[in-house]
Amino acid sequence: MIRILLAEDDDAMRTYLARALENAGYEVVAVDRGTAAVPFLEEQHFDLLLSDIVMPEMDGIELAQICADIAPRTKVMFITGFAAVSMKASREAPGTKVLSKPFHLKDLVMEVERIFDDQWTARI
C-alpha cells in the first residue's frame, strides 16, 4: 500500500485531504506542521510527502529539502493557495508537483495516482 505523509496546518483541510486519500486506498499519516513531519520521515517509510507550502515553524519548501536529505526516494507534492508561493516552490524544489488551491478532492487523488503511474511506467 502506498503511504503518504500529509503536512497541512489547516485542521479542516487536513481532515478532508486525509479522508479523500484514504478513501482512494492510500495509507495516510497527517500532521499539522512541517516540524511534526520530520520525525515521521526519520522513522518511517513514505512514498509521498504531500505538504502545504505556507505553514508555521517550517514551510513546505524547507520540509521538502529535509525530506530529500532524509528520504531521497520519497516523492514530494505541494498544495498551496498562493500563486507566487507556487512559483517559488517550482524554482526551489524542482521536480515536485504543485497543486493550487482551491481544487476538487478528485483532482488531488488523480494527481497522486499520476505520480505513481509515472513511477511504475518508468520501471517497465
Describe each model-derived feature in a short phrase.
Residues R33, D59-L63:
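Acidic catalytic/metal-coordinating carboxylates
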Residues M55:
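Receiver (REC) domain active-site loop signature in two-component systems and cognate sites
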Residues D52:
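Active-site residues of response regulator receiver
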